[in-house]
From Swiss-Prot:
GO cellular component labels: cyanelle thylakoid membrane; phycobilisome
Function: Light-harvesting photosynthetic bile pigment-protein from the phycobiliprotein complex. Allophycocyanin has a maximum absorption at approximately 650 nanometers.
Domain of life: Eukaryota
Entry comment on modification after translation: Contains one covalently linked phycocyanobilin chromophore.
Summary of subunit composition and partner proteins: Heterodimer of an alpha and a beta chain.
The keyword Membrane appears for this protein: yes
Family as reported in the entry's similarity comment: Belongs to the phycobiliprotein family.
Higher taxonomy: Eukaryota, Glaucocystophyceae, Cyanophoraceae, Cyanophora
NCBIfam families membership: apcB
Identification of the protein by name: Allophycocyanin subunit beta-18
Topological relation to the membrane, as annotated: Peripheral membrane protein
Cell location: Plastid, Cyanelle thylakoid membrane
Pfam families on file: Phycobilisome (PF00502)
Binding sites annotated in the UniProt record for (2R,3E)-phycocyanobilin: C82
Length: 169
């Protein structure tokens, strides 16, 4: 798992270059948002149950066929698996928020997920929507706590949603 700094160093190391102005700007951006990223993750961690419950409730309200007979979250086992997966996306999003790098999402979440879901007959579209709901709920809580610059929250959630949506074509 990499973070923004180790990724930057690796890029410059491979090319044998010293940091240029772009590298310094990247480092400044990383450090200037560090406190807000840490505080945001603290808020998410303190509200995991609420975030998951809110996102799942909204998803099932929007798509009741998921919990209807024959739906992918109909049985207790499938419903629990759905909630487990939603929790998984949220947890790894927090890792990406702290590291300011989405590599962990590829390594630990996205690689092979489409194939797994397809083999189980699970639609990708509700997963993408659940990730969007996690993002929205998290941002609301973070903004309510007084952290106004929260654009960095979007990156991991949007990245997961885009990769999954693109992979389902």
């Amino acid at each position: 798992m990499k973070d923004a700094i180790t990724s930057l160093i690796a890029t410059y190391d491979v090319t044998g270059k010293y940091f240029d102005d772009n590298a310094v700007d990247t480092l400044n951006a990383y450090f200037s948002t560090a406190s807000a990223r840490i505080e945001s993750v603290k808020i998410i961690n303190a509200n995991v149950s609420t975030i998951i419950k809110t996102a799942a409730s909204a998803l099932f309200d929007e798509q009741p066929e998921l919990i209807a007979p024959g739906g992918n979250a109909n049985t207790t086992r499938r419903y629990a698996a759905c909630l487990r997966d939603i929790d998984y996306y949220l947890r790894y999003a927090t890792y990406a928020i702290i590291s300011a790098d989405v590599d962990v999402l590829d390594e630990r979440v996205l690689d092979g997920l489409k194939e797994t879901y397809n083999s189980l007959g699970v639609s990708i579209a509700p997963t993408v929507r659940a990730i969007e709901l996690l993002k929205n709920t998290s941002k609301e809580l973070i903004k309510a706590a007084g952290i106004s610059a929260v654009d960095f929250i979007d990156e991991p959630f949007d990245y997961m949603g885009k990769v999954l949506a693109d992979s389902s074509l």
